[in-house]
């Protein structure tokens, strides 16, 4: 009976088809892209992309955390890590002062590799992100020699309009609530979207939708700088 009512095979088929279309279109835009079946394959793939001795910076990303790349790098003990958003076991910043985090964030631009997620990726091969501080999207488009972007298949959308709709009406409210619940950030908890789940295009001082960046590919001379690993699981927000 269960075999007739579960949708595991159908979900796998649906996500794989969309992922392969997305990978093909990213590659047409001079972005390296690869589809892997699960987080375990993603971890192996990314670790193979990071040579010993290079400096790795991390952008704030649930997907990077869920795949477990940073603990694996720490265990390997062969790479310097830059993470302005590093937190302790209670979810609090290791660097509580904003000037400390700003200084470390600037160091990200000289990293050899930047590890990060993306808010959405379109079927026609565009990466869409909305950021609060701007450090994450800035390093994606300029600075580090190589960018490795990890993304779950749940973030594949039809086009830029659908991406922005998803970000403003799902990703942003969820992220604001996450920062409130898991990182004790009362300022984010007071945002309208964190209270109601609905975006009202607010002008709150702590609004997290500040910088919108759409990556439509890279110039041929930058081919291979951006590397997308699409994972056949629902990851991140």
Q: What residue spans do the PLM features occupy?
A:
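Short N-terminal helix-initiation segments at or just after the protein's N-terminus
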Residues: 1-3, 87-97, 171, 175
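N-terminal active-site beta-alpha-beta segment that forms phosphate/nucleotide-binding
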Residues: 15, 19-98, 105, 110-114
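Conserved phosphate- and dinucleotide-binding cores of soluble alpha/beta proteins
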Residues: 107-237
């Amino acid at each position: 009976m269960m075999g007739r009512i579960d949708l595991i095979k159908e979900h796998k088929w649906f996500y794989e088809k969309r992922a392969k279309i997305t990978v093909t279109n990213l590659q047409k835009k001079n972005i390296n892209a690869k589809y892997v079946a699960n987080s375990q394959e993603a971890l192996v793939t990314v670790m193979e992309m990071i040579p010993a001795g290079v400096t790795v910076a991390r952008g704030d990303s649930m997907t990077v955390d869920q795949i477990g790349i940073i603990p694996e790098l720490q265990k390997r003990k062969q790479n310097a890590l830059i993470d302005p958003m590093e937190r302790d076991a209670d979810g609090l910043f290791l660097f509580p002062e904003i000037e400390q985090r700003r200084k470390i964030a600037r160091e990200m631009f000289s990293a050899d590799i930047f590890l990060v997620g993306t808010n959405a990726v379109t079927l026609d091969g565009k990466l869409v992100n909305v950021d609060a501080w701007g450090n994450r999207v800035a390093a994606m488009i300029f600075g580090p020699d190589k960018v490795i972007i990890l993304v779950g298949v749940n973030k594949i959308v039809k086009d830029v309009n659908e991406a922005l709709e998803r970000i403003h009406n799902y990703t942003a409210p969820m992220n604001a609530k996450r920062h409130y619940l898991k990182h004790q950030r009362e300022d984010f908890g007071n945002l309208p979207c964190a209270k109601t789940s609905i975006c009202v295009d607010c002008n709150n001082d702590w609004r997290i939708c500040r910088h919108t960046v759409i990556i439509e590919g890279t110039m041929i001379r930058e081919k291979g700088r951006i590397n997308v690993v699409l994972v056949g699981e629902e990851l991140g927000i």
